[in-house]
Amino acid sequence: MNRTLAFVAIIFIVFSAAACGKKTPPQQAAVQAQGALSTLRGLAGAYEKKQLSSFMDKVSNDYPDRQAFSQSIAGIFTKYDTIRFTVQYTKMIIMIDERTNMKMTFNWDGDWQTAGGRIVKDGGRVSFVYDPKGAVLLSIEGKNPFVPKESQGKQ
C-alpha cells in the first residue's frame, strides 16, 4: 500500500514538473492584435476627449482622403460638447493574415450631445483595417462610427 502511494506521488510530481515548462513568447499574431486593440482604445479615448491631433496620430497617412476625414472630425468636435463612444470588446473578431493587412470587426455605439442638450445616438457594426506593422488605421469598411448618423451626408 505504501509503495503504491509513493509510486502515485512520484508520478504526480513528474507530471507536474513536466507541465511547468518554460514560458514561450507570444506569437506575432498576438502581438499584432494587441497593437490593434491599443490603437482602437487610443482612437476611442482621443475621440471622446476631442483631441484631434492625438486621434489623427493613430490614422495612417495612407487613409483614403485623410484631410477630409480630419476636417470632418474637427467639425464634429466643434459641433458637439460631449461625445461618448463605446466599443463592445466582447463582440469582436480580429483577422490577421501574414501577407495582408489585419481587420478588426466590432460593434459600437455612441452619443453626441450639443450645448443645447440635443442628443444624437448611433451605433452599428464596422470593420477597421490596420497596417500590421504599425497598427495604424488604414481604412474603415462600413459606416464611419466617428461621424454620427445626422452628419453622414456632410463629410
Please place each PLM-identified region on the residue numbering:
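Short, low-complexity N-terminal intrinsically disordered segments enriched in polar/charged residues
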Residues: 19-49, 57, 61
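Solvent-exposed coil/turn segments that connect beta secondary-structure elements
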Residues: 61, 90, 107-111, 129-133, ...
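Sec-dependent bacterial lipoprotein signal peptides
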Residues: 1-18
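Surface-exposed, charged secondary-structure patches
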Residues: 75-127
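Hydrophobic pocket/interface hotspot
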Residues: 43, 55, 69, 128
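Short beta-strand edge/turn micro-motifs at domain boundaries
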Residues: 22-24, 119-155
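A short gly/proline-enriched turn/hairpin at secondary-structure junctions
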Residues: 56-71
